[in-house]
């Protein structure tokens, strides 16, 4: 087939219109929209680029963002753990560099002076107390000496349950054991009168026997042997328990309590309670008499 040639013949009228057209005089001319459209075209063109390049550009933009000026709700900057740790270490190492010496106010000086005066007064009072303690120690020594003078030495040698017991101790004179020991000494002091008379009688008899005929002497009495110490006395269970009770009373400090609650004290308290009860009965009887008298008087007035 023969090739057909096509030729485009320009329209002369259109060319003339284009030559006489002024863009700025056109009513639809808006350069701002054209710029926006051009920007959109550029953006469209950029969107049409490679995906890999777009990702790289975005990462670069993210790295360039400065987050140091972002503030939290509490007002401070957002800090990482490493930043907080660095700040704490810096504060520990430089904590004494920020100290400032301030002038001491007058009130603090006055308080310091008051404390110094109080310490001086305390020292003076303590020195006075030391002197009083020394004086008290002297008085205590004198009282201990007086107490030692009031104490007595108890020496006992007796045989109980087949064993010989030797006792030697210091006790106060006013204690129960001391009183019992003193009573036993009184008994011993009163007892030797009879042996002396017996000795005199034996001597007279011996003299008479020498004059006449010598007879065998009688065996000396047991009481004399006990007093002289040749024969140790045997304690009965009752006497031993009495000694043990007296020593226990002194050791436990029950002497005053026993004196307070003895039989005489109990009887005295019973008498006191009886007197109080009788006084209450008398008062009750007196009040009853007054009530009866008032009732009789009211009955007589009513009649």
UniProtKB/Swiss-Prot annotation:
Biased composition (Basic and acidic residues): 1-12, 55-72, 200-211
Broad class of the protein's primary localization: nucleus
Residue numbers bearing the Phosphoserine modification: 209
This protein's record includes keyword Phosphoprotein: yes
Signal peptide: none
Subcellular location: Nucleus
GO biological process, any: chromatin remodeling
PROSITE patterns: BCNT_C (PS51279)
Residues in BCNT-C domain copies: 217-294
Assembly and binders: Component of the SWR1 chromatin remodeling complex composed of at least ACT1, ARP4, RVB1, RVB2, ARP6, YAF9, VPS71, VPS72, SWC3, SWC4, SWC5, SWC7 and SWR1, and perhaps BDF1.
Family indicated by similarity: Belongs to the SWC5 family.
Protein name per the record: SWR1-complex protein 5
Source organism of this protein record: Saccharomyces cerevisiae (strain ATCC 204508 / S288c) (Baker's yeast)
């Amino acid at each position: 087939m023969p090739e057909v040639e096509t030729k485009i013949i320009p329209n002369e009228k259109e060319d003339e219109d284009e030559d006489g057209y002024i863009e700025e005089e056109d009513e639809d001319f808006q350069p701002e929209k054209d710029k926006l459209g051009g920007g959109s075209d550029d953006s469209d063109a950029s969107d049409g680029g490679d995906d890999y390049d777009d990702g790289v550009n975005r990462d670069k933009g993210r790295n360039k963002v400065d987050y140091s000026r972002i503030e939290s709700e509490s007002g401070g900057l957002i800090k990482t753990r490493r930043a907080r740790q660095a700040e704490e270490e810096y504060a520990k190492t430089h904590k004494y560099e920020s100290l400032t010496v301030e002038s001491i106010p007058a009130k603090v000086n006055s308080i310091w002076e008051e404390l110094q005066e109080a310490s001086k007064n305390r020292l003076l009072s303590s020195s006075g107390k030391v002197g009083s303690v020394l004086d008290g120690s002297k008085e205590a020594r004198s009282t201990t000496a007086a107490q030692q003078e009031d104490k007595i030495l108890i020496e006992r040698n007796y045989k109980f349950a087949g064993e010989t017991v030797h006792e030697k101790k210091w006790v106060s004179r006013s204690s129960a054991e001391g009183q019992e020991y003193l009573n036993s000494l009184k008994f011993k002091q009163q007892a030797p009168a009879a042996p002396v008379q017996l000795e005199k009688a034996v001597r007279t008899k011996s003299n008479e026997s020498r004059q006449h005929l010598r007879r065998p002497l009688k065996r000396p009495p047991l009481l004399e042997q006990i007093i002289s110490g040749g024969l140790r006395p045997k304690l009965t269970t009752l006497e031993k328990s009495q000694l043990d009770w007296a020593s226990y009373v002194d050791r436990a400090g029950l002497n005053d309590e026993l004196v307070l609650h003895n039989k005489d004290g109990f009887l005295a308290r019973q008498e006191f309670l009886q007197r109080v009860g009788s006084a209450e009965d008398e008062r009750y009887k007196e009040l009853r008499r007054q009530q009866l008298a008032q009732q009789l008087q009211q009955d007589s007035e009513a009649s």
